[in-house]
Structures are given as C-alpha cells and as structure tokens.
C-alpha cells in the first residue's frame, strides 16, 4: 500500500502554486493508494462550484469553492489520467478568510464519514476539529483511514484523541 499524509497549509505558503505543482508531480509519480491532507483550504469569498461523483460530501461540509485545494488537485490529476475519490471534513474558519479542514483521497471508491472530536462545534472557533474517515479497498483488502489534525498537546489533544479511540 502506498500512503501519503501531508499538512498542506494550502494557499498559505510562499510560492503556493509552485508547491502545488511539485505535489501534483509527486503524486503522479508515486500513484499513492491513499492520501490524507490536513489544513486543506478554500477562500470563504470565492465562488461555489458543482462537484462530480468522485467527491463524497460529509454532513458538516460547506459548499466546495472554485479554489478548494483538493478539488483543484484532483482535477489536475484526472487530466493526467490519475483519478481519486475524495472527501473533506470542514473544521473551522482559518485566518479570518479560509474554510479549513482535512481530506482523504483514495484511488478506489470510498465510504466517507466524520467524527467531531472537539468540545466545540462552531466554524468560527478554531478549536473545532473533525476527523475525515474513509472506508475503501486497497489491493483487495478493506481498510479504514482517517485524516486527523488535532489541537496542541496541552490545548485539547488528549481529549480529542480519546474520542477517536
């Protein structure tokens, strides 16, 4: 099984477009079975777009926007012949202008769910944390994977981790 996890800090880094291209090229080269991303962002004010059947929406999902990091990445990968199913768990507003969350991508169809692990469930509170869970198959074996971005050790991590267990 080829697995990648990465805190993308999407659209917040210097040379974000260059890093996006580097990531796309690495995925095309490695052809990961499963990918988990954290800090997957989209601007709050950009236009909402339609999604295709490869996107598996969760109950907490805010609409997907034109600049959604994973949507764009999956679209570019598909143009190169590499298709991924994906889901995104929306957590909270980041830096006053971003919808931020965690994502799971799978080369095989997936069943998506989420777990609220924080004490709060308020998108305006950066303490809000959800885990994106995907059940899928890899090499004929059923697997469950989770994309997790928990609080700092002394700011809620232990309680959040206990809710996952």
PLM feature segments, named:
Residues 1-4, 97-102, 106-112, 126-147:
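Beta-strand-turn-beta hairpins that frame and shape the catalytic cleft
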Residues 1-98, 141, 160-163:
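N-terminal, active-site-proximal structural segment of metallo-dependent hydrolase catalytic domains
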Residues 10-15, 122-124, 154-157:
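Short, flexible loop segments at the rims of nucleotide/cofactor-binding pockets, characterized by
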Residues 21-22, 120-121, 128-132:
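Alpha-helical scaffolding within the catalytic cores
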Residues 38, 43, 106, 116, ...:
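Conserved residues at the C-terminal ends of beta-strands
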Residues 82-87, 109-115:
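Short secondary-structure junctions
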Residues 89-93, 118-123:
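Short, P/G- and charge-enriched loop/turn segments at secondary-structure junctions
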Residues 140-165:
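Active-site beta-loop-alpha substructure in enzyme catalytic cores
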């Amino acid at each position: 099984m080829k697995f990648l996890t990465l805190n993308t800090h999407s659209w917040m880094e210097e040379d974000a477009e260059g890093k996006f291209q580097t990531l796309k090229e690495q995925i095309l080269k490695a052809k990961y079975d499963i990918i988990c991303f954290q800090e997957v962002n989209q601007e709050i004010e950009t236009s909402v777009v339609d999604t295709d059947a490869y996107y598996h929406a969760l109950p907490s999902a805010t609409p997907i926007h034109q600049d959604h990091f994973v949507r764009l990445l999956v679209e570019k990968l598909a143009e190169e012949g590499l298709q991924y199913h994906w889901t995104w768990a929306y957590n909270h507003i980041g830096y006053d202008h971003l919808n931020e969350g965690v994502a799971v991508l799978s080369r095989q169809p997936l069943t998506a769910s989420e777990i609220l692990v924080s004490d709060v469930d308020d998108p305006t509170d950066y303490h809000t944390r959800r885990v994106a869970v995907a059940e899928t198959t890899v090499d004929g074996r059923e697997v469950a994977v989770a994309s997790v971005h928990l609080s700092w050790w002394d700011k809620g991590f232990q309680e959040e981790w206990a809710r996952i267990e």
